[in-house]
Amino acid sequence: MVRYKATISYDGTLFSGFQRQRHLRTVQEEIEKTLYKLNNGTKIIIHGAGRTDAGVHAYGQVIHFDLPQEQEVEKLRFALDTQTPEDIDVVNIEKVADDFHCRYQKHLKTYEFLVDNGRPKNPMMRHYTTHYPYTLNIKLMQDAINGLVGTHDFTGFTAAGTSVQNKVRTITKATVSRDEKTDFLVFTFSGNGFLYKQVRNMVGTLLKIGNGQMPVEQVKVILSSKNRQLAGPTISGNGLYLKEICYEN
């Protein structure tokens, strides 16, 4: 068997997330169906570096899969790209070592979250940004977001019911700025891993701070108390993008 690593992008609007689910359309299912056709009915299982939720998009999701025979990578990329649905793009494919695993290999993930703060909202972007029509103080959010950088237990920012035991993660970059062209707010987070709905919960909290409903110090309070009830709401995922995954070595 030969192992391949692929970088893919997708519009998450019509997907029920990345991971295969019974009777639901997912990114994993569509790619596996295409690989099945390309390999004469051989079942191929793909593995993803991140499991994006319904409606969440990706510019740089990484997957890996094993094929029975070695193939020329550009021909494989082109075939997979042209035969998957229009809302999936296969950006790059490369042959990797047999022990490479896109999820467990040490890596850095970057997520981006777009917020339309306009009144009225931009209806053309309703699937690609999350609308927040209330007044926001970006300076307050910038002060608060700095408290997320570093190694912390992010229990207070994860969704209830997660099966993950170790909730310590390291965030190396956390910024918020306003895009001058679109006027959207752009939240960017880079780190060695993120918990279930962590990014959406962090953005929901920062918006509350920007609106004056929570103090700037609330981020540190949530981290120290590990209390999800003290954080903001889980904001809708249509503004969330898995932007990039960088592997060591």
Swiss-Prot record:
The keyword tRNA processing applies. The keyword Nucleotide-binding does not apply. Substrate binds at residue 111. Its EC number is 5.4.99.12. GO terms for molecular function: RNA binding; tRNA pseudouridine(38-40) synthase activity. It holds the Pfam family PseudoU_synth_1. The active site is at 53 (nucleophile). Disulfide bonds: none annotated. One of its GO terms (biological process) is tRNA pseudouridine synthesis. It is an enzyme of class 5 (isomerase). Keywords: Isomerase, tRNA processing. CDD domains: PseudoU_synth_EcTruA. It catalyses: uridine(38/39/40) in tRNA = pseudouridine(38/39/40) in tRNA. Homodimer. Belongs to the tRNA pseudouridine synthase TruA family. Formation of pseudouridine at positions 38, 39 and 40 in the anticodon stem and loop of transfer RNAs. This is tRNA pseudouridine synthase A. The gene is truA.
